[in-house]
Amino acid sequence: MATVLAIETSCDETAVAIVNNRNVCSSVVASQIALHKTYGGVVPEMASREHLITINACLEEALAQSNLSWSDIDGVAATMAPGLVGALMVGATTAKTLAIVHQKPFVGVHHLEGHIYATYLSDPTWEPPFLCLLVSGGHTSLIWVKDCGFYEQLGATRDDAAGEAFDKVARLLNLGYPGGPVIDRLAKTGNPQAFALPEGRVSLPEGGYHPYDSSFSGLKTAVLRLVQTLEKDDKNSLPVADLAASFQSTVARSLTKKSIACALDYGINSIAVGGGVAANSELRKQLQEAGINHNIKVHFPPLKWCTDNAAMIGCAAADHLNRGHTSSLSLNVNSRLSITDVMQLYEF
């Protein structure tokens, strides 16, 4: 029953949490949305500097919230991959320093494995095997979760990730950053059937289409051309709500079809969803309904565990620590490590 202090700094949230197995003792998240909003996206150098400014206050708050002392903590964890290198280094260096000072084992964690473990934070009874749909600003993947550290990627995006597509379409519609939440809100007042948009299919060299891979660049381009056409016809009245609803519904429909098809083909009877786009209300609606229709259990974590946080990192780290998996203090951060290579982070 390991208790872990975990740090997450892979992108633009500075987060610290203390987790006992699947129970959250404290969780602190300092968002940088306001900092990057002016630029329409995350500026890596600014993100790293902000992590340096914020990390100590987050550590102090997490310890205070937990009512625990260092004698109660069994290990220190940090996200080591993937992510922005400079941002990752802030969390990794901080965690390693704490591990040395307090003589605790260090546990490096894969960010996507953290999103998988967010499922357990809200439902501690959930266990592998299951299919995980990971959808965020940087990733769109269908992952067969076999056990702690052992994953098979069955589907991925070939270009833009789903969350990235939301941000880019929001920019086209002058809705600001981040795009996901504002499109979700606006779509509630629009007609999702107003415009027919392509779901995006990935062609195979031998012909046909990949059943589980995604592509969103064509959808983004279709929205751009539609906006250009509509602006020519009526420069004073762009149907932004209808465009947002049609785009969002298309993304949700595509992800739902691929997830259900993958689960059925592989005989998997449960799907967990993780990542920032898991907060999207239309995706939740469509996938839950499809799950009921096909007798597949579908789990979405609460909204607070969809976006980046350190509690999910701590949950994954605790599981690894319980199994005797620890990381070397010489372990380097890695901006592109695949989810299938998670066990490269550990010595055991």
Curated annotation (Swiss-Prot):
Keywords: Acyltransferase, Cytoplasm, Iron, Metal-binding, Transferase, tRNA processing. GO terms for cellular component: cytoplasm. Binds 1 Fe(2+) ion per subunit. Fe cation binds at H111, H115, D308. Its cofactor is Fe(2+). The keyword Transcription does not apply. Belongs to the KAE1 / TsaD family. This is tRNA N6-adenosine threonylcarbamoyltransferase. It comes from Rippkaea orientalis (strain PCC 8801 / RF-1) (Cyanothece sp. (strain PCC 8801)). The lineage of its organism: Bacteria, Bacillati, Cyanobacteriota, Cyanophyceae, Oscillatoriophycideae. The gene is tsaD.
